[in-house]
Amino acid sequence: PIAGSMVLAAILLKLGGYGIIRMMQILPATKTDMFLPFIVLALWGAILANLTCLQQTDLKSLIAYSSISHMGLVVAAIIIQTPWGLSGAMALMIAHGFTSSALFCLANTTYERTHTRILILTRGFHNILPMTTTWWLFVNLMNIAIPPTMNFTSELLIMSTLFNWCPTTIIMLGLSMLITASYSLHMFLSTQMGPTPLNNQTEPTHSREHLLMALHVIPLMMISMKPELIT
């Protein structure tokens, strides 16, 4: 069910990050070296999840693995226990909560019209549903973390935190972000561009679907422009 996927990606997945934040408060803040294996594991897990996204043919699985890769960055930032790291981790959890939920919503919009989640069978929607293609572009750009979105701010804080802690981590972070951009663009091009393989008539989009997307994108942009709204 699409509602379950949206709640799982937007809220339940972030509860683990919140639990780690609460647990780290009772641990000594100066002993980050003892957590080195966990930080490396989190970053390596993010890269592996990103690589898994690149080879996915199922649209819903691709979005699910995307959420896992972003949580790897969140865990690494939390474990370092710096103010910038915690701020970046919380901001990324909020930003990616909106983004992943919107992606699942768009995937369901496509599925209701094609009755398949295979990427190659869902292409060609830019001619049939241009407004939906616009939403796909907006949300994928947020997933890539372009400025001035909250995703960009949070990833910049996490990158600064990890680089100050150990400059070598910039290699893993850079690789992770490069692959994130690759699969996000691949997802957009695969689902929207090219000739449509369907010969049957496609149902137009409904106002409720555009309203649902607006309720994801507009709050995220408002928080990006004015973070004081949630502080």
Curated annotation (Swiss-Prot):
Catalysed reactions listed for this entry: a ubiquinone + NADH + 5 H(+)(in) = a ubiquinol + NAD(+) + 4 H(+)(out)
EC nos: 7.1.1.2
Coiled coil: none
Gene Ontology MF: a single term: ubiquinone binding
Membrane-spanning parts: 1-21, 34-54, 63-85, 89-111, 128-148, 169-189
Keywords: Electron transport, Membrane, Mitochondrion, NAD, Respiratory chain, Translocase, Transmembrane, Transmembrane helix, Transport, Ubiquinone
GO CC aspect terms: mitochondrial membrane
Bilayer disposition of the protein: Multi-pass membrane protein
Localization terms from the record: Mitochondrion membrane
Keyword Transmembrane attached: yes
Function text: Core subunit of the mitochondrial membrane respiratory chain NADH dehydrogenase (Complex I) that is believed to belong to the minimal assembly required for catalysis. Complex I functions in the transfer of electrons from NADH to the respiratory chain. The immediate electron acceptor for the enzyme is believed to be ubiquinone.
Designated name of the protein: NADH-ubiquinone oxidoreductase chain 4
Organism expressing this protein natively: Deinagkistrodon acutus
